[in-house]
């Protein structure tokens, strides 16, 4: 199978390395210097340093060439760009007149200004593209790059997209499950990043494992309430893309969003944290969108609201925790 991976950050690079073990895989990035480094060293020293990539993996900075590689009926196009870049990338596909027949995205979050999920963005930009879906689940790029075991879920309303994604990814140390709850999978992937910031704050303040367990559990309730209101199914949030991804991102020290929370608790400014991180922290980008959607649906999301207070309103992390503890008692 031909596979084009669009986006050579840590996640796109790790997935491309996995795919290249079985398939004719091309990795694209708009940064020609990054591509030149990949071609010379077969290592992404900027985003996934120390991990050798397969010799068979090819690289290109020409979007047209990448789209042509992934646009055949028997090919797959994997979108590994951040949510913030989806609309531009889909628009470029449309303008180039080279829309892949089968598309799966691996980014997580809401579009910041429109509050749309990725499947809504592709519907707006590529209305004729119907074989598409989302691949998500508890996964750190570095561990995938090291070929450690991982389980992910592909969700699509297209059986052909599910089958093609399964055929592409389900080998080696990667296990793929299938489903059709696109909304539930996308909401879980977005909200867990915000909740991971909350858990990082609590851990950074030294509040203990009891507090961590409470935040994860009550955070899952927030995720599920919003997801169901937006059209997802409740059972999705107890699976890999909900609870599984939340546990990993909230507790794993490779988590960028957890790192943001830890650093906020240590008193660092958000700008300094993001500048030093060098990678996207989607929880910061989409926190306000999550809260706005919750308010529009009249859904209480106090943990998310507390995170937004710390990120954007100057609330001290310890004061945000105190605010949560002062909430009125209620039935679970």
Curated annotation (Swiss-Prot):
Catalytic activity: sn-glycerol 3-phosphate + NAD(+) = dihydroxyacetone phosphate + NADH + H(+); sn-glycerol 3-phosphate + NADP(+) = dihydroxyacetone phosphate + NADPH + H(+)
Binding site for NADPH: 11, 30, 108, 141, 256, 280, 282
UniProt-listed Gene3D superfamilies: N-(1-d-carboxylethyl)-l-norvaline Dehydrogenase, domain 2 (1.10.1040.10), NAD(P)-binding Rossmann-like Domain (3.40.50.720)
UniProt-annotated location(s): Cytoplasm
EC number: 1.1.1.94
Pathway(s) per entry: Membrane lipid metabolism; glycerophospholipid metabolism
Source domain of life: Bacteria
GO biological process, one term: phospholipid biosynthetic process
Membrane-spanning intervals of the chain: none
Location of the active site: 192 (proton acceptor)
Repeat found in the keyword field: no
Gene Ontology molecular function: glycerol-3-phosphate dehydrogenase [NAD(P)+] activity; NAD binding
Keywords, sorted A to Z: Cytoplasm, Lipid biosynthesis, Lipid metabolism, NAD, NADP, Nucleotide-binding, Oxidoreductase, Phospholipid biosynthesis, Phospholipid metabolism
InterPro entries associated with the record: 6-PGluconate_DH-like_C_sf, 6PGD_dom2, G3P_DH_NAD-dep, G3P_DH_NAD-dep_C, G3P_DH_NAD-dep_N, NAD(P)-bd_dom_sf
Stretch forming the signal peptide: none
Gene Ontology CC annotation, any one: cytosol
Record-listed sn-glycerol 3-phosphate binding positions: 108, 137, 139, 192, 245, 255-257
Family: Belongs to the NAD-dependent glycerol-3-phosphate dehydrogenase family.
Functional note: Catalyzes the reduction of the glycolytic intermediate dihydroxyacetone phosphate (DHAP) to sn-glycerol 3-phosphate (G3P), the key precursor for phospholipid synthesis.
Cross-referenced PANTHER family: GLYCEROL-3-PHOSPHATE DEHYDROGENASE, GLYCEROL-3-PHOSPHATE DEHYDROGENASE [NAD(+)] 2, CHLOROPLASTIC
Name the record gives this protein: Glycerol-3-phosphate dehydrogenase [NAD(P)+]
Taxonomic source organism: Burkholderia ambifaria (strain MC40-6)
């Amino acid at each position: 199978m031909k596979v084009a991976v669009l986006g050579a950050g840590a996640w796109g690079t790790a997935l491309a390395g996995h795919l290249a073990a079985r398939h004719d895989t091309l990795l694209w990035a708009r940064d020609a210097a990054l591509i030149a480094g990949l071609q010379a060293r077969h290592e992404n020293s900027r985003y996934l340093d120390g991990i050798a990539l397969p010799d068979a993996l090819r690289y290109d900075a020409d979007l047209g060439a990448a789209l042509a590689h992934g646009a055949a009926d028997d090919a797959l196009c994997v979108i590994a760009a951040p949510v913030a870049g989806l609309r531009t990338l889909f628009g470029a596909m449309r303008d180039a007149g080279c829309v892949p027949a089968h598309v799966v995205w691996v980014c997580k979050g809401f579009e910041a200004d429109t509050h749309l999920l990725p499947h809504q963005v592709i519907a707006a930009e590529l209305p004729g593209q119907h074989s598409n879906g989302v691949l998500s689940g508890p996964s750190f790029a570095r561990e995938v790059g090291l070929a450690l075991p991982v389980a992910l879920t592909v969700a699509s309303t297209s059986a052909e997209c599910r089958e093609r994604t399964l055929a592409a990814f389900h080998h080696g140390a990667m296990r793929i499950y299938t489903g059709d709850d696109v909304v539930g999978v996308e909401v879980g992937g977005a909200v867990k990043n915000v909740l991971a910031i909350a858990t990082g704050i609590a851990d950074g303040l030294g509040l203990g494992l009891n507090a961590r367990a409470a935040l994860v559990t009550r955070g899952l309730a927030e995720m599920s309430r919003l997801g169901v209101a937006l059209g997802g199914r409740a059972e999705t949030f107890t699976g890999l893309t909900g609870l599984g991804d939340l546990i990993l991102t909230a507790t794993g020290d490779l988590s960028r969003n957890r790192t943001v929370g830890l650093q906020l608790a240590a008193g660092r400014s958000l700008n300094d944290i993001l500048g030093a991180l060098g990678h996207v922290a989607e929880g910061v980008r989409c926190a306000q969108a999550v809260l706005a959607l919750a308010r529009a649906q009249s859904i209480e999301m106090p943990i998310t609201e507390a995170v937004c207070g710390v990120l954007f309103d100057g609330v001290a992390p310890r004061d945000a925790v105190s605010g949560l503890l002062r909430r009125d008692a209620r039935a679970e």
